[in-house]
């Protein structure tokens, strides 16, 4: 099925952001694990898998619309050098993705591509949940202090 070029462009823009966040979350997961924060690292690793599945969904949709998934135009990774920076970098990237998702949803709606819109809406919902989680981590650090936060992050079940 031949898709609308504007929708395909927006899908590719969101795909590029997902490809960046896959790598960013994966690296942050390994950094945190290396620092001894197993549980926190595991959360970021699982998030990289969520991002990978979302990217796969976009690739399938772009191909269905007879477009070409653009895997070459990757943005810049934001890599933190402390736990606070990691959370801040990931929040920045998630907020960037949120803006791109809103724009893509509006384009899909305007072009009457309701299947793409629904796919993007689902990804937006997941994105908002992760933004909330990251903001909660920042609030926890602010309320209990970084040393206490890191102590809880280092504890194993």
Curated annotation (Swiss-Prot):
**How is its cofactor bound, per UniProt?**
Binds 1 heme b (iron(II)-protoporphyrin IX) group per dimer.
Q: Which residues bind heme b?
A: 52
Q: GO MF annotations for this entry?
A: ferric iron binding; ferroxidase activity; heme binding
Can you tell me where the transmembrane regions are? Answer: none
The entry marks the following residues as binding Fe cation, namely 51, 94, 130
Q: Which cofactor is recorded for it?
A: heme b
* Gene Ontology biological-process annotations: intracellular iron ion homeostasis; iron ion transport
Instruction: Identify the keywords attached in UniProt to this record, alphabetized.
Output: Cytoplasm, Heme, Iron, Iron storage, Metal-binding
Entry's Gene Ontology cellular component terms: cytosol
Per its UniProt entry, which superkingdom is the organism in? Bacteria
* Subunit comment: Forms a bacterioferritin (BFR) complex with BfrA. Heterooligomer of 24 subunits, arranged as 12 dimers, that are packed together to form an approximately spherical molecule with a central cavity, in which large amounts of iron can be deposited.
By what name is this protein known? Bacterioferritin BfrB
Q: Which lineage ranks, top first, belong to the organism behind this chain?
A: Bacteria, Pseudomonadati, Pseudomonadota, Betaproteobacteria, Neisseriales
Source gene? bfrB
């Amino acid at each position: 099925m031949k898709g609308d070029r504007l929708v395909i462009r927006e899908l590719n823009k969101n795909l590029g952001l997902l490809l960046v966040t896959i790598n960013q979350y994966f690296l942050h997961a390994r950094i945190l694990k290396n620092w001894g924060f197993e549980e926190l690292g595991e959360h970021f690793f699982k998030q990289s898998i969520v991002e990978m599945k979302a990217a796969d969904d976009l690739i399938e949709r772009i191909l269905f619309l007879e477009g070409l998934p653009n895997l070459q135009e990757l943005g810049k990774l934001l890599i933190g050098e402390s736990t606070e920076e990691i959370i801040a970098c990931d929040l920045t990237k998630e907020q960037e993705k949120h803006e791109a998702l809103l724009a893509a949803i509006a384009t899909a709606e305007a072009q009457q591509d309701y299947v793409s819109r629904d796919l993007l809406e689902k990804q937006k919902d997941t994105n908002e949940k992760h933004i909330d989680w990251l903001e909660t981590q920042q609030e926890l650090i602010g309320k209990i202090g970084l040393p206490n936060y890191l102590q809880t992050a280092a504890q194993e079940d």
